[in-house]
Amino acid sequence: MGFTSYSGPASAFPGKGTWKDFDTIFNLNKPEMLQTGDSGEDVGRIYNAVKEAAKEVGVEERVIFCIIMQESTGNVGVGTTIDPGSHPTGGLMQAEKSPAFPGQHNLSQEQISSMVTAGTKHFKANLKQLDDQDTATTIYRALRLYNSGSIDESNLSDGQGATPSYVSDIANRLQGRTN
């Protein structure tokens, strides 16, 4: 199933009722994660790390995992990049101040969890900048902040120097679509 393009305000994006459950989304993406060089153990540890971070930080598992897939394709050894504000962003969620292990695989649970927790805390801070509600519209708005650091409420596909399709791509991933 191909990606559908969404744009406009958060209300124009698909509601939570269209989102697949975490296990379904995770299992649909396993083949893609394994193609990055991740071991089966790495993939299992990503699953555990998402569950842990969701419980510890208070962000939905499926949102955390879809950010991981959008940012790094689940590659535990993904390289560090530079965000629009010229800050290094690393790890599975490409978050500022996240631990990163470029080029490495077969990581420990602690290493993988550290990346997922750092990114999840960063996203939670974006949620708190808004109304910290567990609604699709707040999550979509926070995703725009996570990716670009700012938000045009009238058009979440205005990347303002970052990836324009970021929120739309994650909306698709939440519905079970893969690359």
Summary of predicted features, one role per range:
Residues V59-E61:
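Helix N-cap / loop-to-helix initiation motif
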Residues S72:
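Glycine-rich His-Gly loop
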Residues M1-G44, K55-V57, S98-N179:
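Non-catalytic cell-wall polysaccharide-engagement segments
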Residues V50:
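Aromatic/hydrophobic pocket-lining residues that form π-stacking "cages" and hydrophobic walls in ligand
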Residues G79-P102:
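Short, surface-exposed glycine/acidic/tryptophan-bearing loops
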